[in-house]
């Protein structure tokens, strides 16, 4: 009886481990997204599903942290960091949900994941839409047993680097609290 329990636990553990392939994680989310994009118009329920897909796919806390210089991040107390992460997530999620046509693809080919240790991976996807290729690179981390992207590089343009440059410019003239207000207003604008 004890052996059967051990074998069952081992099988479940192996299945869970096998399910955590970073390429498979991206393919699954991409398939859901492509299904939603094929619809000519999306109702509010489907728009919310897109936002939930983004929440499930991205590590917004790490993306937010990497969107600031190490010094700017460390200079903030935990409450300010949390508020920044929450508003940043809202802004990125809302603006990404509005610009989804960029991710529409007739076909997609995924390269094998490039692993860095057991908890970091890079997955490159080649998307073709109407004969034009776009290359997306997902920089990923294993978070609570799930692969999540913390940066998306589209045709050599890094999301994290782009935000870092923008926020660095803003913080030259404004306080961190003012940066959070700017991000919050942008999130409100894109929510409509």
Predicted features, each with a name:
Residues 4-13:
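Sec-dependent N-terminal signal peptides
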Residues 151-192:
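Low-complexity, intrinsically disordered terminal/linker segments enriched in charged
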Residues 20-99:
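Early exported N-terminus immediately downstream of N-terminal targeting peptides
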Residues 94-134, 186-192:
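Surface-exposed, charged secondary-structure patches
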Residues 40, 114, 153-156:
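Short loop or secondary-structure boundary microenvironments that flank
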Residues 65-70, 101-107, 169-171:
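Juxtamembrane/interface motifs at transmembrane-helix termini
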Residues 133-161:
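Short beta-strand edge/turn micro-motifs at domain boundaries
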